[in-house]
Amino acid sequence: MALKKRTVVSPAAGAVSLPSLMADLPGTRRLEEVPLDKLSPAPADWNFYAPLPDDKLLELIESIRANDLLHPIVVWKQPDGALVILSGHNRVRAYTALLEKTGEDKYRRIPATVLTDITADEAHEIVVDSNYVQRVLTPSEKARSISQKYALAGRKKRSRNGVRKSKYEQIGEEYNLSARQIARYVRLGSLDGS
């Protein structure tokens, strides 16, 4: 599968924003409010990232209470109607905590970009890319992210000028890293068992 060309840069490297990443989402999408109790997390092997520490989660809760949710979560609607969280696990945790603490009905549903007509590989890529954009990753998380991105990437493809690019070069352009750095992260990620 050939991945869609986009630039994805981590916060440590001067991030592309989450909204700009979300503007390039594949598939059919619509914005709606979805019930918290209908959401399920992405598979653990896709979403291996540590949850926010308690102090950062409290900051998120207070921000949502004061300003509402600034960025909708992203969910993948399965053919059976199940909703899998692709981006926003911590926002769902914050909404759940607010519902438990306040009992207010407005926290029973959360704004979401609902995606349909996407593949499992595209869904997996959204989990990896959104976490890469939003967080300062540990070295092992970064290696595992890049290793998974590499596994999802297609074979060599031609660039606009007709030159073939390796998967390392393709991902390096997206993540603002050299092909050599990508190769190193892929090797490190494979040591981690991803």
Give the predicted meaning of each segment:
Residues 1-2, 162:
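Short, low-complexity interaction segments enriched in Ser/Thr/Pro/Gly
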